[in-house]
Amino acid sequence: MQDLSAVKAFHALCQHKSLTAAAKALEQPKSTLSRRLAQLEEDLGQSLLMRQGNRLTLTKAGEVFAVYSEQLLELANKSQEALQELNNQVTGELTLVVHPNLIRGWLSQVLDEFMQQHSTLKIRLLSQFQHSDEVFEPDLIIWIEHAAPMGYRKERLGYWRYAAYASPKYLAHRDKPTHPRELIHHPWIDFIACRRAELELHHPEFGSYSLPALESRLQSDNLAMQADAIAKGRGIGLLPTWFANGFETAHPGSLIPCVNGWQSQPTEINCFYPLGRHPLRLRLFIDALRQARPDEWQ
């Protein structure tokens, strides 16, 4: 059985192709990495790396052992996690991909509380993801609508419903619209996520109305910018009712709902996690998400 620290040193050298970069990544002296690599090569009776200019390249033996080093390290991590779960210890790292419009306000609070509860856990949070990226496999994806990526299970967290909002400043000089058909007479702030050839709005008493695509000087896919533009009196625009209520709580007197009772079709908020059994840290975080769902998402 190979020394795990030596295998980690070799793996880092494979990844970074440089003794200096690998030492920096592992936060170890270069002399330590060199010594561990030399010991590993002596134990295996094979040269694993060779220098070409300023870069390190794998020998034939190194290419073979690199495959097994990945497996050794993965197995070591899994065994460590299994032992820690015996004591309900949450360690390691969670890699999350989260839609930018879900981070502010809601997820940031969930993450903060979760990390305070589990002081040794590391979080890597990204707001960009493409299905075509086959190498990158996050532990959890939280997204607005979206089909489940290959190899992931979908769980619906809730729904957003969009409604039209204006600011008191804007309505001080204009009549407040009472029906969606009147929106065509107002400057429109277009939220790209809701832009269609036409947008179906629904009312519990008056049925449906198809709002045509409206010309807009400002188009944005960022909720914070959308809300700011509306609050500044630039026109009328759509916001998720949950987000608008939170914005109004934080900035009283900023937003007023227009055409009361008219809302868009529900938009799904989903999380996606890999098939199979999950480590304790992911299971607990998914539970935390379920418990933190706002009532307005139901």
From Swiss-Prot:
Residues 19-38 bind DNA. Coiled coil: none annotated. GO terms for molecular function: DNA-binding transcription factor activity; sequence-specific DNA binding. Belongs to the LysR transcriptional regulatory family. InterPro entries: LysR_subst-bd (IPR005119), Tscrpt_reg_HTH_LysR (IPR000847), WH-like_DNA-bd_sf (IPR036388), WH_DNA-bd_sf (IPR036390). The keyword Acetylation does not apply. Transcription activation of the irgA gene. In the presence of sufficient iron, transcription of both irgA and irgB is negatively regulated by a fur-like protein. In low iron conditions, negative regulation of transcription is removed, and production of irgB leads to positive transcriptional activation of irgA. Keywords: Activator, DNA-binding, Transcription, Transcription regulation, Virulence. Pfam families: HTH_1, LysR_substrate. One of its GO terms (biological process) is DNA-templated transcription. This is Iron-regulated virulence regulatory protein IrgB. Residues 1-59 form the HTH lysR-type domain. Gene3D superfamilies: 3.40.190.290, Winged helix-like DNA-binding domain superfamily/Winged helix DNA-binding domain (1.10.10.10).
